[in-house]
Amino acid sequence: MTRKDFFNVLTRYFPWVDEQTFMSFEKYKTIIQKYNQIFNLTRLDSDDKIYQNFFLDSLAPYKELDFFTQNTNLKLIDIGSGSGIPGVVLKIIFKNLNLTLLEANQKRCEFLKILTQELGLNDVLIWNMRAEDLTQSMRESFDIATSRAVASLDKILEISAAFVKVNGYLIQPKSIKFYEEELKAKNIIKTLYLERIALKDFWENDYHHLVGVYLKKQITPLQFPRPWNLILKKPL
């Protein structure tokens, strides 16, 4: 994907984007390429791969969600943010978003600090912790929790749900394996009082994307999330 192609698609998805938005993405791309070897961020560091696999694939799931509007000021936590995907990408488009980036890897947290500073982003918090540890102090705090390629659906829902307020959303982009993963997650979905209210189904980058949108209907029981090693050993 060329720079021109990316900008054309971006404008189609989000008509309010301006030249400053385009320049922020260009700067983001340059920062990834500059620091990739230092922080071991990704194997996809060519221009076309960053435009397509990083930026566009991260944004596409959010283009048709009613509660993501130009001036949204929702509180969102990106769990396992890594190189800022999808949280920082969303922040560039939705400038009033109140963003928290959660990343367990210290080196990648250092990169996220550099990235957000160089992009001049406001209302961004970065936590170098595991999700199950941070939930002890930030339960029921966010409107939205999301992640990308962190874990299977049952696991990511368990470590995410406690962060979200009642009537908030968990947004989980997945591949065509979504249905298989959701079947395995049916017990945790019920236990955590979640309900899938939407399934966004679309093609992007020649891949079939499925995005599950879950509504949190009640407060998450205090015993969740369990320690990560227990989540791995004894899935519900």
UniProtKB/Swiss-Prot annotation:
Q: Which family does it belong to?
A: Belongs to the methyltransferase superfamily. RNA methyltransferase RsmG family.
Record protein name field: Ribosomal RNA small subunit methyltransferase G
Alphabetical list of CDD domains matching this protein:
AdoMet_MTases
Q: What does this protein do?
A: Specifically methylates the N7 position of a guanine in 16S rRNA.
HAMAP family assigned: 16SrRNA_methyltr_G (MF_00074)
Q: Which InterPro entries match?
A: rRNA_ssu_MeTfrase_G (IPR003682), SAM-dependent_MTases_sf (IPR029063)
Query: Source species, please?
Result: Ureaplasma parvum serovar 3 (strain ATCC 27815 / 27 / NCTC 11736)
**GO molecular function: any one?**
rRNA (guanine-N7-)-methyltransferase activity
Its gene is rsmG
The protein's Enzyme Commission number: 2.1.1.-
